[in-house]
Amino acid sequence: LTESTFYILLALASEPLHGYGIIKKVELLSENTIILAAGTLYGALENLKKSHLVDQMLIQDNSRRKVYQITDTGLEVLSHDYLRMKKLCLIAESILKKGEK
């Protein structure tokens, strides 16, 4: 996963959100280091939908907003990528600590 798609999936892991909600949640989670433009977000969401990592929910209130939710497969991929990055960080930490000596 790219950093942006990781944050999009992470934002959706706690609750379904509409596009603007995803943008704001990603900004919050990333401490404003990831600022998604609308075009970038919707392109990423389309790719995530094609990969079956995100679904678009049907809204009954006649709203024009599209709400997205993470799928079970999306949660698995997010968890796997988290563990991959965690392992990478542990390896880097070990190497960098050796370099400090």
Report the location of each language-model feature.
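Basic, amphipathic "hinge/linker" alpha-helix immediately C-terminal to the N-terminal HTH DNA-binding motif
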Residues: N62-Y82
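Beta-hairpin "wing" of winged helix-turn-helix
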Residues: K49-R64, Q69
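Conserved anionic group-binding/transfer micro-motifs
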Residues: I22, L41, G74, M85
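Amphipathic alpha-helical dimerization/coiled-coil segments
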Residues: E76-K101
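Short, well-ordered turn and helix-capping elements at secondary-structure junctions
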Residues: V26, S30, L58-Q60, D72-G74
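Basic amphipathic alpha-helical segments that dock to polyanions
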Residues: L41-Y42, L48
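N-terminal helix-turn-helix DNA-binding core of bacterial DNA-binding proteins
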Residues: L1-T40
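A generic structural signal for ordered secondary structure
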Residues: G19, S30, R65, E93-L96
